[in-house]
Amino acid sequence: MTQKLHIALLFGGNSSEHDVSKRSAHNIYDALDKEKYDVSLFMFTKDGILLGNEDSQKIFDGEPEDQVVAEAYQKMDMSSPLAPIMALNEQKEIDFFFPVIHGNLGEDGTIQGLFKLLNKPYVGSNIAASAMSFDKDLTKKIISQAGIRNTPYVVVTPENQADYSWGRIEEKLGNLTFVKPAKQGSSVGIHRVTNAEEYEKALDDAFKYDYKILVEQGIANPQEIEISILGNEHPIASKLGAVRVPKDDPFYDYENKFVDASGVVFELPVKLPQYLVDEITDMALKAYKALGMKGMARIDFLVDSNNVPYLGEPNTLPGFTNISLYPQMWEVSGISYSDLIDRLIQLGLQEFERNSKIKYDFRKLGTERVGQKKYNED
């Protein structure tokens, strides 16, 4: 009998997507084939503290989170903020990590750094790709260098804010712009801006979430198109999906995504001219490779009235809730939810195996390096 792979499913986190992460984790847990996998649960609280399997399971099973967390804190070694994390290292039976932590901590390279320290395989992109893809400014710099179309923008910080009055923004970008924190997910802190008063209010709010703010040129009445990517060195793309928001809503915001999605319509697969489908697919795959992403990503596009696509944002750990488009786009492309989860695990194992062959100490290379003398220590 083949030994089961022991999966650690990590969820929660200290971002605004804490509850979304819990819903994603439930779906992934249900989709994991228990004939193949043993599963342990580890939840990061809203304070960013990691709970063990027993307490995480209680919350997973529906016990009041605040009560379970309070009781867990009382019995937990809080002498060092690293204590709960180091306790994870003692779980020697864990073979593989499946993070479902959206936003900061989960998508900014932090949790990936922990997995690297623990020397364990995991689902998704590595530290660098996660960090670059989570920072909207870095993403735009990289995809622009790769020749991928995206909207013009400027970066506003507390230090240069005086240089970017609304008059200057309007001159550079026009009178329809979007103000966005550079490192936030799920449309948190994003504002549609058309005048000086809105601009000042938007900056004040966005600075609550980050000290680097993007002000992007807006596109009037765009189509919001999404595509799912799966793979490592040779990624594949799903069929495209569209998000149709109510006409009274300016864009697909946090409210639409997580509070009241009743007016949102998903078109799967979306009907677009084939040349446009091909262009978006090519842009998405090119961006995936340029950013060094692995495992999976959902990539968002805006398409203007002339059917010109602009790459919006990549998401290295997309949602897996009942309304999340990432798994739905694969469903309509012929890959079931459970098969998708299996593939993601296999991709993580393959990437770990590939990276394990890299030598980090040149003294151990000896004569393997062509044209270099064998290293001899004195």
Curated annotation (Swiss-Prot):
Pathway: Cell wall biogenesis; peptidoglycan biosynthesis. GO terms for molecular function: ATP binding; D-alanine-D-alanine ligase activity; metal ion binding. Keywords: ATP-binding, Cell shape, Cell wall biogenesis/degradation, Cytoplasm, Ligase, Magnesium, Manganese, Metal-binding, Nucleotide-binding, Peptidoglycan synthesis. Its EC number is 6.3.2.4. GO terms for biological process: cell wall organization; peptidoglycan biosynthetic process; regulation of cell shape. ATP binds at residues 170-225. Mg(2+) 1 binds at D300, E313. Its cofactor is Mg(2+); Mn(2+). This is D-alanine--D-alanine ligase. The keyword ATP-binding applies. HAMAP family: Dala_Dala_lig. It is found in: Cytoplasm. It is an enzyme of class 6 (ligase). Mg(2+) 2 binds at E313, N315. Belongs to the D-alanine--D-alanine ligase family. One of its GO terms (cellular component) is cytosol. Binds 2 magnesium or manganese ions per subunit. Residues 140-346 form the ATP-grasp domain. It catalyses: 2 D-alanine + ATP = D-alanyl-D-alanine + ADP + phosphate + H(+).
